[in-house]
Amino acid sequence: MITSLKFNNCFAFNNTIEMSLKADMRTKKFTSNVTNISDNLNILKSTAIYGPNNTGKTTLINCIKAIKGTLLNKEIHLDSNIFTGSDICEEAISFIYDNKEYSYEYKFDDKKMMYIYEKMCEIVKDQYNNEKEKLIFLKDTIDEKYECPQDEELAKVLNIASNNNILIYTVQIEKFPILEKIKTILTGIANNIEIVDMNKIPNSKTIQMLKNKDDETKKVVEFIKNADLYLEDYMYIEDLNVEIDGKVVDEKILKNQNFMDQIKIVSVYKGQAVPSIIFDSLGTRKFAALASYVIEAIEQGKTLVIDELDSSLHFKITRAIISMFNNEINKKAQLIATLHDISLLDCKRMFRKEQIWFTDKDENGTDLYSLKEFSYAENGVRDTSNIQEKYIKGEFGAIPEPDLISTLLEVDNEEI
């Protein structure tokens, strides 16, 4: 599970953006929305991010994607902000792995395409419950500091290791047991993060699960059926014959396996099996594609990051998906989602205040902040407040003020 994220000079973020996914220990409301790691560490199971278009919601997702790609040695897309004059992108993530909390950060020069700074720590607490960093390694080419307290031999090679990639991919890990452990931890958290864009979500994962015909297949199918989409069944038919102009077409002729898979996904209505790609709505097909990601996250305790979760989905379905994470049955799965549907801005029945975040932008740049920052004493915001109403009134910022009607007035004046 992710405990915090921090980005600076990445894409639209021209300054430091921080997001904590740790629960407020003073809040006893909706304890089912929280995973208890230890006596003094509770992690939020879900986080909802709101804000106008073009204010940084997708940028946040892209930053997480860059971290995942970096840790898995994949080709990444990470650009510095064009207005800062700096080429250095900074990314940091804190997370839980094997019931311990770690932090990892790096600085990437997107002009030289080099990693000029890396640091990894274990986060521990002292006798007074204050968080302390226990250094695992530091590779700082800026100030020329190279440390690895647990392995002096590794520390000696940090200054000659290549900067073209992060440490775990530039030094032979077989020679350094501590480095092998570091790689296991970092790739472990990266593989535990799934990222989905609802505007272009592939259904390949759902297709593969349907092909497997195992327990997860049953859960995916039940999940889709229980969404009240009027579906009686949802399946993949391997030996389905494809006909064009009344003639059965050989699969070898069509060749495109992805196309064939799409055709072989069928929905059943009133006992009649029909091709999903033809008969199902866009929202139904998106939900079916998302089903496998949700089930996998719940079953395997993954962190599921979704951009535009409510795209083409009824608000009750979106609410039900969030509720799957916000419940006592879910132990370790985590949801981070961007949203526009304000009907889900609900602290009476759905979210704790620290689970709701906003992005906003002004002449100084982009900002990211939590509803928790708005108190009753200063802002009149309680857990029982009507958050939707206050958001519409602009009391939290992060709301657009479109003036589209002026366009019509200008056109009308020109015609006159």
Could you say what each language-model-derived stretch is?
Residues 41-81, 287-288, 293, 324:
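Phosphate-binding glycine-rich loops of NTP-binding sites
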Residues 1-66:
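Pre-Walker A-like glycine/lysine-rich segment at the N-terminus of P-loop NTPase domains
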Residues 314-319:
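Short alpha-helix of the ABC ATPase nucleotide-binding domain corresponding to the H-loop/switch region
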Residues 1-3, 320-416:
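C-terminal lobe/lid and adjacent interdomain/linker elements of RecA-like ASCE P-loop ATPase modules
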Residues 7, 91-97, 267:
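Short beta-strand segments that buttress and anchor functional surface loops
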Residues 8, 200-279, 396, 400-401, ...:
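Extended helical coiled-coil dimerization/tether regions that scaffold
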